[in-house]
Amino acid sequence: MQESEIQKPKMQEKFKDHLKKYESDEDYISYINRPLGLFNAYINTYVGPDIKTGLALCHGHNHSIEKFKKIKFINYWYLIDGDAYSFPDYICDLTDIKQLEYFPDDFFDCIMSIYCRVVDTDDNLQYFNILDNVKRILKHDGFFISTELERLFFRFMNDDELIRMNNQLIKLTDEDEIKKYINNFNVKLHFGEDTENITEKQKTFIILNHFEFQKNNTIDIKSIILEKIKLVLKRNGYYFVDLIGEYIFFVPIERVTNKKELLKYTNCD
């Protein structure tokens, strides 16, 4: 008997309690339903019954195939996770992002990522290389939803852009307060290293972390962040469609037919 065959029952046993909690814990249910509910709302508002096939790049540990099945119109989901048995009630179709290469062109109506990063965030170029593949396997009228880009967008900006953005954000709060926060930030805990000179990306992370706890200027902060997200998407060949909560909907630029609408949403000076 192979080792994998021995481990499989243990895996299923491991997620027994997870499934029980999923069905009984109200707070937990709302936590995992939120992105799927918004995704469903988006399909109802913008898309309609032509959506049939979806691909989910996500951690199965937080979800259940039954929740995906409740999303309107989509008849079949392909699920990908590094752990084939991460879903308590489904064995993943794919376990390696590279397996996306085997899908034919124009195959999926929608592709989504929930809560987890599509790839290791240490390699931001790889992230968008994967999105290049997404362009290929997405149907001409398909769309992509990302739930992590709002927190990770700054990883795809150069230092000059980050300096300008950081200065914009700092002006929205007490400069002495934010400098103190930056100086007292536990760099070792968050970045795994002790350093006197933090990078611009690290500084951006710290500033955004500071604003997470502030209630003032939220509209101005979101406006700055959204402007930069549009810039990042445009530079990588995508057209921003909508932002609902923390969930960003976008499509490949070459799939957009209304160029006036494209210019309206993607001009970011």
Curated annotation (Swiss-Prot):
Q: Which Gene3D superfamilies match?
A: Vaccinia Virus protein VP39 (3.40.50.150)
Superkingdom of this protein's organism: Viruses
**Name of this protein:** Uncharacterized protein L16
**Protein source organism:** Acanthamoeba polyphaga mimivirus
The root-end lineage is: Viruses, Varidnaviria, Bamfordvirae, Nucleocytoviricota, Megaviricetes
